[in-house]
Amino acid sequence: MRYFYDTEFIEDGHTIELISIGVVAEDGREYYAVSTEFDPERAGSWVRTHVLPKLPPPASQLWRSRQQIRLDLEEFLRIDGTDSIELWAWVGAYDHVALCQLWGPMTALPPTVPRFTRELRQLWEDRGCPRMPPRPRDVHDALVDARDQLRRFRLITSTDDAGRGAAR
């Protein structure tokens, strides 16, 4: 199963602190959560302007501990299932680190969770940079961005048998 995801985070060149994560499965399921453990005081001006205002109110049940987000993702990704898990993100290096850190060190990742994220931006370039529709108006909301990544994947791979050859 392919999973398209995005994270919002605070980074200072030394650490990456998860703010929120959105994941969209190819079968239409969606997951979104905001970490109760990030420190908004550490956010730079860009994150304060473009990310924090888009978060749900702190009383929302979408705000969850990192431990609960990890448990939710284990269920959402069906880590005990038989389908292989493919993670996809647009320029996903920091997203992958933010995701993996939910389990602690990378060695603590469940065996079925990939140690890498497939790069949607690279796939787009490899396919000749096909024209994409404009980004949604509410970008930098992790779930909105994850939905947009699935849409982009489908557009990029629409000529190769419904995307089955995307990872070649």
UniProtKB/Swiss-Prot annotation:
Ranges where the record places region RNA binding: 6-9
Cofactor(s) in the UniProt record: Mg(2+)
Enzyme class: hydrolase
Keyword Kinase: no
Keywords: Exonuclease, Hydrolase, Magnesium, Metal-binding, Nuclease
Source species, domain of life: Bacteria
Binding residue positions for Mg(2+): 6
Alphabetical list of SUPFAM superfamilies matching this protein: Ribonuclease H-like
Note accompanying the cofactor annotation: Binds 1 Mg(2+) ion per subunit.
Gene Ontology MF: a single term: magnesium ion binding
Pfam families xref list: Rv2179c-like (PF16473)
Position of the signal peptide: none
EC number of this enzyme: 3.1.13.-
Means of activity regulation: Inhibited by EDTA.
InterPro entries linked to this entry: 3_5_Exoribonuc_actinobac, RNaseH-like_sf, RNaseH_sf, Rv2179c-like
Function per UniProt: Exonuclease that cleaves single-stranded 3' overhangs of double-stranded RNA. Has no activity with 5' overhangs. Has negligible endonuclease activity. Can bind ATP, dATP and AMP (in vitro); the nucleotide occupies the predicted substrate binding site.
Quaternary structure, from the entry: Homodimer.
Other information: Member of the DEDD group of RNAses that are characterized by the presence of four acidic residues in the active site. These residues are conserved even when the proteins have highly divergent sequences. Has high structural similarity to RNase T despite very low sequence identity.
The protein's name: 3'-5' exoribonuclease Rv2179c
Organism name: Mycobacterium tuberculosis (strain ATCC 25618 / H37Rv)
Lineage: Bacteria, Bacillati, Actinomycetota, Actinomycetes, Mycobacteriales
